[in-house]
Amino acid sequence: MSQLDLNALNELPKVDRVLALAEINAQLETLSAEERVAWALENLPGEYVLSSSFGIQAAVSLHLVNQIRPDIPVILTDTGYLFPETYQFIDELTDKLKLNLKVYRAGESPAWQEARYGKLWEQGVEGIEKYNDINKVEPMNRALKELKAQTWFAGLRREQSGSRAHLPVLATQRGVFKVLPIIDWDNRTVYQYLQKHGLKYHPLWDQGYLSVGDTHTTRKWEPGMAEEETRFFGLKRECGLHEG
């Protein structure tokens, strides 16, 4: 399928897009993560971007994509409520991997948001969704627009949650192509990649955190908990960036 044909997929209804992409995804499932990135760079339109929350396994996709496409813009949506260890991890990986980091934030500061709306994350699912819209979704939409992105790489994996269990390698979202090169990797493959390339997990991994987001909606894993329960009080798994 030519690049022009792929562009035309964006004009189709969602169901038709999924059906049209099914054959391509069947082929992509047989490729390695590195081959998927190379295929996308050859067959999908630029500009290209990579998003990262700089979470537990973030070093994998940051290293993998940046090795193949040096200087690719790396989008971080900073809520202002990340753990101190996350900000330190961002600095460490940006320096080590020479990342072209692009930080986007909400138009309202965290203090201003609390003054206007209260602590949205304490206001149930509706409050959490509003918080995510302000601090994650709008900044990401702005980033994609300002960077003129047409192809978006992300480091999601099916093993991470039920909401990600059936995601394809290639899809369309927010009017761009979205590529998930390590979507089928398990925890062992992640560990092996980190070891092979001298990379580290997020610092909070050693303290029992399986997933890391904002300080107020992230919980340390305890025996008997599902990974989904460590984020957003178990009410949600996704922050909104990878939905829709």
UniProtKB/Swiss-Prot annotation:
Q: Does the keyword Cytoplasm apply?
A: yes
Q: Where is the active site?
A: 239 (nucleophile)
Instruction: Kindly tell me the pathway this chain contributes to.
Output: Sulfur metabolism; hydrogen sulfide biosynthesis; sulfite from sulfate: step 3/3
What EC number(s) does this enzyme carry?
1.8.4.8
What domain of life does the UniProt record list for this protein's source? Bacteria
Q: Which GO terms describe its molecular function?
A: phosphoadenylyl-sulfate reductase (thioredoxin) activity
Q: Can you supply a Gene Ontology BP term from the record?
A: hydrogen sulfide biosynthetic process
One Gene Ontology cellular component term attached to this UniProt record is: cytoplasm
Keywords attached to this entry: Cytoplasm, Oxidoreductase
Please write the reaction equations for the catalytic activity of this protein: [thioredoxin]-disulfide + sulfite + adenosine 3',5'-bisphosphate + 2 H(+) = [thioredoxin]-dithiol + 3'-phosphoadenylyl sulfate
Tell me where it resides.
Cytoplasm
Chief place of localization? cytoplasm
Pfam families per UniProt: PAPS_reduct
Enzyme class name? oxidoreductase
Q: Which family does it belong to?
A: Belongs to the PAPS reductase family. CysH subfamily.
The free-text function statement in the UniProt record for this protein reads: Catalyzes the formation of sulfite from phosphoadenosine 5'-phosphosulfate (PAPS) using thioredoxin as an electron donor.
NCBIfam families found in the cross-reference section: cysH (TIGR00434), PAPS_reductase (TIGR02057), PRK02090.1 (NF002537)
**PANTHER family (UniProt xref):** PHOSPHOADENOSINE PHOSPHOSULFATE REDUCTASE (PTHR46509:SF1)
Q: What is this protein called?
A: Phosphoadenosine 5'-phosphosulfate reductase
Q: Which organism is it from?
A: Salmonella choleraesuis (strain SC-B67)
